[in-house]
Amino acid sequence: MDINTLIQTLQSAVPQIAGSCCIVNGALMNLTEVQNMGYDGFSMRAKMNMPLKLYKYFPNRPTELIDKQTGKPIKDEITGNTKTINYSIQALRDNTVFMQSPSLFDDVYDSDIGLNYLEYEKARLLEYCIRCEIDVKETMETPELANALMQTIADMINSTGNIDFLFKNTTVTKNEDLSNQCFLLELKNQLYKGKDLGESLRNVIVSDFNRYLQYLQDSFRATCFATTPYSQLMWGGSYADCHRGFCVEYTVLPNDPQYRKLFLNLFPMIYCKVRPNMTEKLVKFQDKEPTMELLWDIYFHGVLRKSIDWAFQNEWRLLLPMERNRTEKDYCVSFFPFTKVFLGNRMSHTARKEVIDICHEKSIPYVGVTRNPDVFEMQECTIKCEDCPYHTNNIPK
C-alpha cells in the first residue's frame, strides 16, 4: 500500500479507527503502541527501518539580511541596495543543514504541544498554594485556589509590607527555586504597575504558561528530510520554489563514528488525526529536572507529531537540543555526505550553471529532473544539462 493510499484510508476511516492509528515511515501503525514504545523503543525501531538515502529540497533564492536590533533590512553602504544571502547555495558549498525553530515551520500545529490554559491555571495555582503551605485540596476549583492564594499574599503584605518570604516549603530543585523567584518578581512588577491583586496574579500565571510553552517548543531545533527526490508536492511548493530550486541526496552512514550523533538523532514523523491534551502530565514536570520521560513526551506529542494531511512528505527529522539566541552560523550543522544533486525543472540557466559549477568543484554527481511524458511523475532527465537545448535556452521542458 503506497503512502497516498494510506492517507486516504486513514482520512476516510470512522473516528474511532482514525483516532487510534498513525502513519510512521510509510507504515500504518497503532498510535497507542507507538506511544508505549517510549524513547528507546521508538528510536531503535526507527534506526532499523531508516532509509539509507535522505533528500532535502532547497528553494535556491536570496534572502534579505535583517538587522536583529532594528528589524530592518541591512543596506550596502556603497550601493544602498539591500544585502541578501542565498542560504541554499551556502548549504551546498559547506555541506550543512540549518537547524530551524519548529515554530517557524509552515504548519501552524508543528511542535505545538497541547496545553490547555484553564487546566494549567488550576494546576499552577494549586502548586503555588502548596508551596505557601496553604491548606488546599485538588478538588477545589480555580476561583477557590486563587482566592486562597490572594488572601495569603494580602495578609503577608499587610503584616510585613512585602512578599519576600511568601513560599514556606523548602525547594526541592534549582528550577523550583528559580520559578519561585520569577513568581515573586513578576507579581511585584504587576503590583508596582498599579494592578489589583487579582489581575496581577492572573498575569503571573499567564506569563508562567507562555514561558513554559515556549520552553517546550524551543527545547530542540529541527531540520527536515524527504525520502524521495521526485515528490511533485515538494518540488512544486515553497520547499523548492516551484521547481526553481534543487534537491540534495545524502547517504546515511550508520556505522561511521564521525556521524554517530547525527544517526542517533534522526527520527521519522508520526502522522495522525488526534492531538492529545498533555496539560496534566506536563505541568508536573515544569520545575523538575528534565527526564527521558519528559523528552519522549516532547518528541511524541510535539516535534515528531503532525497532521495526517502532511503524510505525503514521509518526513524524517534531525532533532538537536540547542539554546536560543545563538548566531545563525551556530545553527548550521554539518551533515552526511552529498551523493547527488537534482536540479529543478524550472531552474534558470544562470542558477543551474551556478549549482553545476559547485558540483564540479566538489565532484558531486548531478542530474536534471524532468516530467514523465506518460504519467504525472517527475523523473531523471537522460540528457546531460550542459547538452540540453531546453535548459541552455531557458525553454520549459
Predicted features by range, described:
Residues D2-K397:
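Partner-binding and oligomerization surfaces adjacent to conserved cores of proteins
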